[in-house]
Structure formats: structure tokens, C-alpha cells
Amino acid sequence: MRRLMIDQLFKLTGHRFKDEEKLKRALTHASVQDSEQGNYERLEFLGDRVLGLLIAEMLYQLFPQASEGELSVRLNHLVNAQTCADIAREMRLPDMIQVGFEMRNFEGRRLINMHADVVEALIAVMYLDGGLESVRPFIQKYWQSRAKKMDAGRRDAKTELQEWAHIQGDAQPHYQVIKRSGPDHDPVFMVEVSISGFASEIGQGSSKRNAERMAAEKILRREGVWKTVEKNDYE
């Protein structure tokens, strides 16, 4: 493995990798058939669990008053493929990944998943090198600011409700207009949102979209998902 790449990864992660073979494996996709060192799949499996644990720990300390429901939504957002892929691109990892010829035109969701997998595989290598303490600075560097920004401006209530419902058991929110009143130039919509296993809520607004958002907010607040007092530092 090129020394320049190893030095670059040290600058990006803050970790001096001890096992060069595992590092090569973390950057190798399964489509590389003649690869002697194997691919990143097993490492990604381990790294996914390490990432989840350290993000959960970080959120537990950052938001001491947050409910379990809110912490779960935040965790899901911070460890999902899109966030990990964004971090991979921030680190310019895609340029380092070895892929087979047929995979060089990856795009869309498959590309996002591959970039995310490599981040998790690198986390596994760090963990195997030196345990959780070897990974924690890397998590702080790339995830802590993202965790804090999530509270600086709330995400769309419908998006957050959908994520929360998924965590509860692959449920999906269903929205239904139950009433429309008022003149055409000043309408009032009432929308009911329901999730299997939970009581429904009704929102009201000047548009269908606003009414849906209000209904989603009611469930998020009722279930304690939207209730936060933020702590400034994660130590």
C-alpha cells in the first residue's frame, strides 16, 4: 500500500494504522475478484456496530434531557448510509476505494452504500488496532458537529416522524384530509396522521402540507421525540 495514502489517512482520521493488510481490505470492494487480502464486508459488519455504540454514547452525553425516542431518531440519522457517505466524500475516500471494472460506473443508492460501507470498515480497523479509544477521536471529528447542528434547526416534522415510525417497527405514517373549509383564496385543511399501534393526531393549516406538518409535530411532541435541552460539549 502506498505510503502517501497511509499518511493521508492518518491526517484524515487522526489514527496511525498498525495493520496495513486490514487497511487494504477496508478499501477493497467485493467486486475485486483477484484480491488476495479479501474485501471490506466483514470489517463493515463490525464497524457498523462500533459506530452505533459510540454515536449512542455521544448523544447520551450531548443531550442529557432528550427522551429515548428523540435519541433514537438522532442516532438513526447520524449512522445512516447518507451521513456516512457524506463523511466519506468529505474525506475523499472514494478516490482510494478499489473496485472491480464492472462496478466503476456505480451511481445512486449503490454508490452511497459503498462509500458508507468503507467508512464503517475503516472504523473497524481502528477498533481492532486499539479498541474504542482509538475510534472516539474520529467520531468526534466528523459526527459531533453534525449531531449539534441537528438541534440548531429542526428537520421537517414529516421526515422526522417517518424515521421515528420506522424505528418503532417499520411502520409508516399515513396522512388523510378529513376536512376542507373556507373560501378558495383562504382555505383551511384538517389532516389526520395515523401510525399503526399509536393514537392518531389531527393538524390544521392553510394548506394540506402545513396541516400534515402540524399533525406530525403533534405526534413527535406527544411521544417525547421533540423535547431537547442541549449540553454544549461532549467529553
Curated annotation (Swiss-Prot):
Record-listed E.C. numbers: 3.1.26.3
Keyword Lipid metabolism among record annotations: no
Enzyme's top EC category: hydrolase
Active site, per annotation: D48, E120
Cross-referenced PROSITE patterns: DS_RBD (PS50137), RNASE_3_1 (PS00517), RNASE_3_2 (PS50142)
GO cellular component: cytoplasm
Molecular functions per Gene Ontology: double-stranded RNA binding; metal ion binding; ribonuclease III activity; rRNA binding
Pfam family, any one: dsrm
Subcellular location: Cytoplasm
Stored SMART domains: DSRM, RIBOc
All copies of domain DRBM, residue ranges: 156-225
Cofactor(s) demanded: Mg(2+)
Alphabetized InterPro entries for the sequence: dsRBD_dom (IPR014720), RNase_III (IPR011907), RNase_III_dom (IPR000999), RNase_III_sf (IPR036389)
Subunit description: Homodimer.
Protein's job: Digests double-stranded RNA. Involved in the processing of primary rRNA transcript to yield the immediate precursors to the large and small rRNAs (23S and 16S). Processes some mRNAs, and tRNAs when they are encoded in the rRNA operon. Processes pre-crRNA and tracrRNA of type II CRISPR loci if present in the organism.
Protein name as it appears in the record: Ribonuclease 3
